[in-house]
């Protein structure tokens, strides 16, 4: 059953997303500029653990010498080094379509994604679009991939060790072990887009 939780602050939301993902939940969040920056430590963990997730970002200017609520990509680019894949939308229709593509691709690739769009114009725009139907969404999500995600969840029935402190040799080996997932991702995203074109 889908649920929605609201955190008292952005930092708590980041930790809640990470925790929910560790339990095998299909979890997403919606963020903009300053809130995204508060999530960066958790984003490194999520990407490092190869956990499927999608963060929908209304991209806005970061506050520097002054606050600005208008759109640019400075917030998204600040989070670029976290290991998240990045998909951009240029219209309301694309925002809907890319959102579904991102959710399907993250399950296949095990790479989390930032799906971002203009945080002032696109996020406030009202427009007629071709709305995705529940059957279309269902067809895009592979049940086997959802099951695999849930089997990687933390459970007393399947104990695993996570969040350890490691010496440089072991840490380096573990970091290199995730490279095949990143190397496969550029092929998975176009395949997911092709599937979307066939389904919708």
Residue ranges and their predicted role:
Residues 1-78, 84-107:
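Thiamine diphosphate
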Residues 113-200:
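Conformationally flexible catalytic loops at phosphate/diphosphate-handling active centers
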Residues 82-83, 177:
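Flexible glycine/proline-enriched surface loops and loop-helix/loop-strand junctions
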């Amino acid at each position: 059953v889908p649920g929605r939780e609201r955190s008292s602050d952005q930092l708590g939301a980041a930790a809640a997303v990470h925790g929910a993902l560790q339990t095998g939940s299909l979890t997403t969040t919606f963020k903009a500029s300053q809130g995204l920056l508060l999530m960066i430590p958790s984003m490194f963990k999520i990407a490092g653990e190869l956990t499927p997730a999608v963060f929908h970002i209304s991209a806005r200017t970061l506050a520097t010498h002054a606050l600005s609520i208008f759109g640019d990509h400075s917030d998204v680019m600040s989070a670029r080094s976290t290991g998240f894949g990045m998909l951009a939308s240029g219209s309301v229709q694309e925002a809907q379509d890319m959102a579904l593509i991102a959710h399907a691709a993250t399950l296949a690739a095990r790479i989390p994604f930032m799906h971002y769009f203009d945080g002032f114009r696109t996020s406030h725009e009202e427009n007629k679009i071709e709305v995705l139907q529940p059957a279309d969404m269902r067809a895009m999500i592979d049940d086997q991939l959802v099951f695999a995600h849930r089997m990687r969840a933390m459970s007393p029935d399947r104990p695993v060790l996570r969040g350890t402190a490691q010496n440089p040799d072991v840490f380096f080996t573990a970091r290199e072990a995730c490279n095949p997932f990143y190397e496969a991702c550029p092929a998975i995203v176009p395949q997911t887009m092709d599937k979307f074109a066939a389904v919708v």
